[in-house]
């Protein structure tokens, strides 16, 4: 979940804007890349859904582990899409589903039983109707940690609370078996519904970015010229500093509390960092490795900046690659990496990632100036 302030950053334009045809090529390829990434996210989420429904139909330890495996696989795709946020697009505009898809951290007791309270959560409250509409209505009701939907609600159902510094949560599959844990039927129903809602929300993003439609977001975005390029840079710049470096790494470093991990139940936070960094690189270079193994390549921000300042484009490309490498160097479990003082190896790895992401956000602001974009509003940590 984003809880950050807006930081207006002004840069002097060093050159005139690039040719309109070059700008349009970048904007159109970006739109195609966004659509492809969301399309793959739906596909992988449906694979996860199939595994979850197979488990719910016949609960077993093997089926439970398969559902977890498919959640992790689907996150690899979704994490890259976070580079498309922060400019009021379909994902997080006024009516966007981001808070329903990926809100965190969540209060486990809002959903289900927790250590010390077997009756906690909406699952154990028979007065709460089990419908998609009700779950959506309850999301963030009464507090931003009252999360009832999305990736992390599903994650909590699959792993349960994490009490270990050395591993993930270890919810028993028998929580979903009648007679083994109270309200197992509601637990099954909840997991099925919250998974369907996630798939539906992701599909709405595919539709918003679908080609060939006259009245969706993509149709207007592709006509936006340099304003659309500004939005693209706001997205990757804000994810670089405000969200990934700030909210997702620095906050946990400061508190040294595993509750501030992004994916704390599954211990997948290290991969969240990598996929976010990969998403930024995808946008900058105009490349994307699809779920089927094919690779998209096209006009990119890097190409556009290189027409005005080749050295800056090269520098930014190098810095973004360094950030991805630093993120890949973060070890698991993340809740061990955040412990200790500044000299601890894990904290050094995290700080290296933060420093690189901070540097690349500055490069991106400079890159915007090089192509005639004089003002940006990036997200900064509070």
List each model region and its residues.
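Bacterial N-terminal signal peptides
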Residues: 1-5
